[in-house]
Amino acid sequence: MSQPTPVTPIDAAPGDVVDRLDAARVAVDDDLARRLGDACSSVSSLDEDRAEAGRDWWPLAIGWAAAGAVPSRPALVARPTDTAQVSAVLALCDEARVPVTPAGGRSGVCGASVPLFGGVALDLCGLAGIGDVDSTSLVADLRAGTFGPDVESGLRDGHGLTLGHWPQSMDLSTVGGWLACRGAGQYSNRYGKIEDMVLGLEVVLADGRIVRTGGTGPRSATGPDLTQLFVGSEGTLGVITEGRFRVHPVPEGEGRRAVGFGSFAGGLDACRRILRRGASPAVLRLYDSTESGRNFDRPDTNVLIVLDEADPALLDATLAVVDEECAGAIGLDVGLVDRWLAHRNDVSALAPLWRSGVVVDTVEVAARWAVLPGLYAAVVDALGGVDGTLVASSHQSHAYADGACLYFTFAGRPPEETDPAGRDAWVGDYYRRAWDEVTRATIDAGGAISHHHGIGLNRGRFLAEGLGGAFDVLASVKQALDPHGILNPGKLGLPTPFGPVPWP
């Protein structure tokens, strides 16, 4: 795979597509376009390329596509094929004060790769492939534009290794996106999140300088960890072009369990006890009764599915802990795990729901075990209180010794009599209020407003409060590394020289 997968067609001819977000867009003049063309393998100002580069998988954009609109198009799409070309593009744009929005598979759901202020969309899919692999030390170099299936097939077929990173967007996303958004995979309890896997980075700064961070050993005490500075920065501090990662032998053993709990809180406590004892099954997912009904046809219980893969001795020990801590639960058919595996990455219903008039999205947050049951109840109640809500539900998707991620789903629909103009306004108001309710409850509980989807545009308005005084530190780092503010402006809630950040 070498190209992004659009979430839904745009219902307009390329030349008729319009921008939905109202912002001051920066043009690329003929001279800069020529110089970029000389520096980069491919540049395009074709309407169809600009339209696709003007959106990602942000759910609001699905509804707009049905009206022939995208969030915001760039003036030009640049497609480099190596780090030197990325460096040249950034140096030229920095000199010209033209914004640059880096992107890979554009599978993000928070608008992080939308070029809000026009300028250049930097498509990194051409920087693909697996570099050096040290099978003895279990270290591999992966280029930023490599899509998930190509990572796993390259490591497994050639070396008998796995990265162990399996996000829901596996088929749609790239190494660079995983790093930039601080992603997490479905097997993360065993293998860690992307920040646990990465050892070092190659990064291009706003002025074109190429820097390498970390990667020289399993650990160092050489000042602050600069690798982690860029992980989760969403392209606002630099453009990641390559990463060095810990990898693992493909495991020999696998085991599965499925049980049900009388309450979501009871299931959460079982997960807490499992992690507390040091067991870390790759998959430990707890669904509330609403989602248990939707996913497993078991609305009478709160389903916990468990899947682990490891050396057989370690696997047996892990599953023994799971069995002991779930002894009081209802035993369920382990085929529920097969059912999850078959559908875990299926998001085919998303676009049809939006096109049918249903507003639907997911919000993942994280908090300590001590507050999770109360946070779950508070969010589901708050979402249910937003006028128009059809359903509000949750599952626990990633767990730690000290807490877990709650992954909420909400869906709403405007009143039947709403006319098209009124419906458009209703969608924006409902969507924003639903997000506000989840985020407010999370902040009040002392939790993290995002676990693995990132901030992008959609959550930018919350980050200053979510980080507190540390947000000023982030803004200072941004100013130091990108003094002209060209890198992905309008994201993470950071100040931008290009004008007010638009919102629908």
Outline where the language-model segments fall.
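Activity-critical C-terminal alpha-helical subdomain
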Residues: 209, 456-504
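FAD-binding subdomain of flavoenzyme oxidoreductases
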Residues: 129-285, 486-487, 499-504
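N-terminal flexible segment immediately upstream of the FAD-binding catalytic core
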Residues: 1-91, 108-138, 289-295, 336-360, ...
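Short, ordered loop/turn segments at secondary-structure junctions
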Residues: 104-107, 168, 286-289, 454
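C-terminal substrate-recognition/cap domain of FAD-linked oxidoreductases
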Residues: 44-64, 249, 255-437, 441, ...
